[in-house]
Design a protein with these regions (language model features):
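Bacterial N-terminal signal peptides that target proteins for export
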Residues: 1-6
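Hydrophobic h-region of N-terminal signal peptides that target proteins for export
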Residues: 10-18
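Low-complexity, acidic/polar, glycine-enriched regions of mature
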Residues: 19-178
């Protein structure tokens, strides 16, 4: 094979091999829900950051959000949440997942999630998420069925009555290719 043909082949093949895709988290709303017989509370954060790197047909995603970025509308309650979840010691919530590249074209996916929160790592299998594609971006919505015991957090109490252990986390994220 001549040097010119080899060079031409390299110029055509190498970019195709390096055509890995990356995704960046553009917008996010993550909200947890706490239920108590006397009231309901939602804490909301828009501070999540994330990146997805695709290679060999698989995409690895990492999302991170500061624990202190969740706002329930009551600064005293938010401070107590930071104490209960050991937010000073473990200031970030991280989530990892791996999805096939082809998942981006589906209307629904079931994702296996690994979430690290309050110093504990928990895995959730086959969590359903809805995908909507618009203008090259993908919006992902769903609910993570988290509980306080999953992360070894003792349920806080109000008037000696503990909150329910379920803390579903509503996810609404928009991803764009980088």
């Amino acid at each position: 094979m001549s040097k010119t043909a080899l060079l031409s082949l390299c110029l055509l093949v190498l970019p195709a091999l390096a055509a890995d895709q990356q995704w960046i988290l553009g917008q996010s709303t993550l909200s947890y829900h706490v239920s108590h017989p006397l009231h309901q509370v939602d804490g909301v954060s828009h501070a999540a950051r994330g990146k997805g790197i695709c290679h060999a047909g698989q995409c690895d995603f990492l999302i991170a959000v500061p624990v202190k970025s969740f706002d329930s509308g009551d600064s005293n309650r938010d401070l107590h949440m930071l104490q209960v979840t050991r937010g000073a010691e473990f200031p970030m919530v991280t989530m990892r997942t791996r999805l096939p590249v082809s998942a981006a074209t589906l209307p629904m996916i079931n994702a296996d999630l690994e979430i690290e929160f309050a110093g504990q790592t928990t895995r959730y299998r086959q969590v359903p998420f809805k995908l909507e594609t618009q203008a090259g971006e993908i919006r992902i919505t769903g609910i993570i069925p988290a509980t306080l015991p999953d992360f070894k957090i003792d349920p806080p109490s109000l008037l000696t009555i503990p909150v329910k252990t379920e803390i579903p986390v509503r996810v609404d994220m928009t991803w764009r290719p980088e």
